[in-house]
Swiss-Prot record:
One of its GO terms (cellular component) is cytosolic small ribosomal subunit. Keywords: Cytoplasm, Ribonucleoprotein, Ribosomal protein. This is Small ribosomal subunit protein uS2. PANTHER family: 40S RIBOSOMAL PROTEIN SA. Pfam families: Ribosomal_S2 (PF00318).
Amino acid sequence: MALSQKEQDIQMMLAAQCHLGTKNCHYQMERYMYRRRQDGIYIINLEKTYEKLQMAARIIVAIENPQDICVLSARPYGQRAVFKFAQYLGCKSMAGRHTPGTFTNQIQKAFEEPRLLILTDPRTDHQPVKESSYMNIPTIAFCDTDSPLTHVDVAIPANNKGKHSIGVLYFLLARMVLEMRDQINVTNPWSVPVDLFFYREPEEAKEAGEEETFEAEGYALPAPVGAAENWGEAAAPAPEAAGYDGAAAAGGFEAAAGFEAAAPPVAGYVAPEAFGGAF
C-alpha cells in the first residue's frame, strides 16, 4: 500500500533524525515530547512537528510580498538551507553573524523591516529574536528540546543541530508553501532534491601532485656569481677592485685605533688620575 504524503514526510524526518532531541528539556517544550529514552535523550513527536510545519506554511503564504520575509541562520549547518529556502520562495536570507541593530537602528545602512522572521535556532539567534520583540515582528523558529520559547510566536519542534535534519525541515517547509501557492501540484511536482538543502563540507585539500606552481621570475633566488651550467666546473674567481690596497687599509685602521693618534682632549677635561684613578 502506498504511503500518503504525510507519512512519506514523517519517514523522511525520521531518516534525517529530526526526532532526536537533547538530554535537557525546557518546560515549555514538554508538550511536544513523545517520550524519553533510557540514555536520557528526549524524543520529539513528529506528528506535532508536521502540524507546526503546516501552520508555519500558512503564515508564510499570508504575506503578500515574499521580500517582507527574512530567514536567518547563525549555525553553519543551516546556512545553505537558508539560502536555498530564500531562492525558491523569493524571500531574504541572512546567514552568519547577525549585526546588532539590523531591525531596530534605522540609521544603519543594513536596516531591515521585515513582516515575518524565520529562525533556525532561537538560542543561537537570540539577538534577532530580541530585536523582533522590540519591533513587533512575528517569529517562526525551529526549536529543540532545550530551546527557550521567549518571544517565539510559532515554535516548530525538531532537531535543529543536525545538518540533515535542518535541511529536511527547510525543504518540507518550502514545498508546503509552494503547494499552498499552487505553484506545484500533483501534475506539476517539485523536482528539487532534498540534498540541495544539506550542508556540504569544505573542499578537501588538493593532492600533493596538484600543488600550485609559481613563475620563476620574482620568486626564485638569484644565480650565484660565476655559476656554470656544469656543477663540476669551478667558478671563475671574481676580479679584484682596481686601486685597492688591503695592507694600506689595514695599516690606516691600526693607526687610527691607537690612543696616541687620537685627538687631544677638550679644554676643561679632567683626567681620572686626579680622582685617585677610580670612580
